[in-house]
């Protein structure tokens, strides 16, 4: 499956995010990845955003806990994720920090950034 992840960089610096991504790579979540920095929108405000893309055989039950961990490590309320399966079906979600107790917004594809 192909995953695309949007990580906001307002509360998080680029090199710190790359360090956590490299740690996940070293532990076998994926072999290779592509990163691009773009401008996204969060709560109506433009925010520099890391767009991470990787292919993996890991299923979503393995990837969601990784993204929840990244939320905590990268001081993110949530991280947007989209996966594309082998039949080109797509599914998007906002993965929230497990400790977040506020309103959880639904995933909205019009705000999601891709490397395509």
What are these regions (language model features)?
Residues 1-116:
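Positively charged, small/polar-rich N-terminal and surface patches that mediate targeting and assembly
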């Amino acid at each position: 499956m192909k995953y695309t992840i949007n990580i906001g960089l307002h509360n998080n610096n680029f090199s710190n995010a790359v360090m956590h991504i490299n740690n996940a790579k070293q532990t076998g979540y994926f072999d290779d990845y592509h990163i691009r920095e773009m401008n996204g929108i969060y709560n109506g405000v433009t925010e520099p955003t890391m767009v991470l893309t990787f292919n993996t055989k890991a299923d979503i039950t393995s990837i969601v806990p990784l993204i929840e961990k990244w939320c905590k490590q990268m001081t993110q309320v949530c991280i947007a994720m989209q996966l594309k399966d082998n039949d080109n079906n797509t599914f998007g979600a906002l993965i929230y920090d497990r400790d977040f107790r506020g309103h959880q917004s639904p995933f909205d594809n019009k705000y999601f950034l891709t490397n395509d």
